[in-house]
Regions:
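Glycine-centered small-residue hotspots that permit tight backbone geometry or close packing
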Residues: 14, 34-35, 44, 153
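PLP-dependent class I/II
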Residues: 1-9, 15-30, 63-362
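Phosphate/diphosphate ligand-binding glycine-rich loop within oxidoreductases
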Residues: 19, 29, 33, 38-42
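Conserved N-terminal alpha-helix of the aminotransferase class I/II PLP-enzyme fold
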Residues: 39-73
Length: 362
């Protein structure tokens, strides 16, 4: 709708604005030059699976067996897809926070299952056990825990995660933990809920956000063998295997690029502080994000527009694009998502335009 606009400032981007690290790109080039261009094992090369397990062991204290408890996928999106297609069936329920990234609900519905959203707007966007418990029924099959969250940037503390894990320990309910932003946490070290409840947790991760590799399409699914041996069958008949060239680049990213995310994270923290101060000075109510690179901003009551109309008027009048909150379920209505995955100069120009626009309503 807005891509054709000249002089557009886009705060809609859901990917890092940094290039893939040079050493990672070179590993991909070397894979081509060395003719590493054939199918790999369905679950991915064993060297990459070992590197992935070693990475999450050192970073998050997780213990997975490379031969049987990790699958290399075509991005985190495929990992989510094959997990749901394995564990869901007609009439089962999946509990999700609202607002939430829109990529889960269609897959749940395609399986004939029922998405059950929990409104977390009045809980500082925190998807805690207290919020979850009232929605659990005998049909509940899975709880989706995306943290840090897209679109809110809010994460969960070690204590909050342990409460959820302890409650679910004796229940026949899976946890799908989407931890794709785990390397982009700002104020606290990321804790995986699998460290408390490995046997019922399917961990989704990947390199799109941590190493700015969105187009390489490399994700990881970690789970106990009794779960992965079923998911692997779906993956096998879905895509055969992940891209062989990208797998070589991914191995380089996880080994030689073990801490590559730190450079990006330092810059994101600076941007977060700048954007937070600018938005609050304009009178917006915002929850400061714990990670990722998004603000989920409440539209002031003085502006009598729904989120879509607000975003449309904003882009038409100022050439600043944001994502309407309604894109993130009905519980995103009344908000908009602003991505700070862009330069400080771009942020300053765009926020100056936004401030001028907001003043018209006061």
């Amino acid at each position: 709708m807005v891509a054709h606009m000249e002089d557009l400032i886009s705060f809609t981007i859901g990917q890092p604005d940094f290039p893939t690290p040079e050493h990672v790109k070179n590993a991909g080039i070397a894979a081509i030059d060395n003719d590493f261009t054939s199918y790999t094992h369905n679950a991915g090369t064993i060297e990459l699976r070992k590197a992935a397990c070693d990475f999450v062991a050192k970073k998050y204290g997780l213990d997975y067996v490379p031969e049987s408890e990790v699958i290399v996928t075509m991005g985190a999106s495929e990992a989510i897809d094959i997990a749901f297609r394995t564990i869901l069936a007609e009439g089962l329920e999946v509990i999700l926070p609202g607002p939430i990234y829109p990529g889960y609900e269609p897959i749940i519905q395609m399986m004939g299952a029922v998405p059950v959203h929990v409104d977390i707007r009045e809980n500082q966007f925190r998807f805690t056990l207290e919020m979850i418990k009232p929605y659990i029924t005998d049909k509940t099959r899975c709880i989706v825990l995306p943290y840090p969250s897209n679109p809110t940037g809010v994460s969960l503390s070690k204590e909050e995660l342990k409460e959820i894990a302890d409650f679910l320990k004796d229940k026949d309910i899976f946890i799908l933990a989407d931890e794709i932003y785990s390397e982009l946490t700002f104020d606290q070290k990321h804790v995986s809920i699998a460290s408390f409840l490995k046997e019922k947790t399917i961990v989704i991760n990947g390199l799109s956000k941590s190493h700015s590799m969105t187009g390489w399409r490399i994700g990881f699914l970690f789970a106990p063998e009794n779960i992965t041996n079923h998911i692997l069958k779906v993956h096998q008949y879905n895509v055969s295997c992940a891209n062989s060239i990208a797998q070589k680049a991914a191995y380089e990213a996880l080994t030689a690029g073990f801490d590559d995310a730190l450079t990006m994270k330092k810059e994101y923290i600076k941007r977060r502080e700048y954007v937070y101060n600018r938005l609050t000075s304009m009178g917006f109510y915002v929850v400061k994000p714990d990670g990722a690179f998004y603000f989920f901003v409440k539209i002031p009551k003085s502006i009598p527009l729904n989120s879509f109309d607000f975003a449309l008027k904003l882009v038409n009048e100022t050439k600043v694009a944001v994502v309407p909150g309604s894109a993130f379920s009905n519980y995103g209505e009344g908000y908009f998502r602003l991505s700070f995955a862009c330069s400080m100069e771009t942020l300053e120009i765009g926020l100056n335009r936004m401030e001028h626009y907001i003043k018209k309503w006061s």
